[in-house]
């Protein structure tokens, strides 16, 4: 154990950060696979609620270790908006994962970087030049390529895009709140509000989970928390410009999980469109992190 720890610490920050981020993409993909499996048994609103609830429970020890004084805030309304947008994003994200192939849901989720560009320009006064406009149009073309064989946008596709837009809004809220509040404060209020918000639609479609479903719900939530933790650790030790492209390996893991667990085989147009979206998103992330990096490490799928 000691030798393994020394070997790990002897690696460069880039290597350690890359390992953490790659591990997070694997765990997020497994979480999505369990969510999709649960979605065939219970409603997506119920799956989203338990993900939010157990996520809140799992982060409580970390939050309270920082002390209750760290939960004070002078911007409760902004926390409320951030939590509501986050809760809506969780519900949309789980609906998309359950009703779309996992690879498609993952690829459409990456469009959050494209939504972030105009939002950051409007709310954070960041640059919005011709090159970034072209990048957004390229990403939109990728979305159209993915949906063309289906004869248009499915409802689940629109929900996936809405989730990406909501996540982009959450990132803006995080950027504004992080200047005055601690990470523990951000995580606590966002998790609590998201759990309360998702509880309402969950009650409308409630179905008592079986013993197996309870185990799957707990495992899914634990995977989400572990993935989030790995993601944060990765970005804590290495630069975002190096790590951000690695996040897109999630598409490969999601495609593998979809194939082996559900028999989903990505079509040629879907993979081509996903490649365009990923390329456009990588360009946005690289230009964003060179100017004003804004990452939301507290909102998981």
Language-model features and meaning:
Residues 1-23, 56-81, 130, 192, ...:
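Membrane-interface interhelical linkers
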Residues 33-36, 44, 59, 150-209, ...:
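Transmembrane alpha-helical segments that form core, pore/gating elements
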Residues 95, 112-134, 205, 252-271:
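C-terminal transmembrane-helix exit sites in multi-pass transporters
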Residues 106-111, 177-190, 228-259:
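Helix-helix packing/entry segments at the starts of transmembrane helices
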Residues 25-33, 60, 83, 87-91, ...:
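Hydrophobic/small/kink-forming positions within alpha-helical transmembrane segments
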Residues 2, 7, 252-301:
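C-terminal-most transmembrane helix of multi-pass membrane proteins
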Residues 131-147, 167, 269-288:
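Hydrophobic transmembrane alpha-helices of multi-pass small-molecule transport proteins
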Residues 27-30, 68-103, 145, 222-237:
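Specific transmembrane alpha-helical segments of multi-pass solute transporters/efflux pumps
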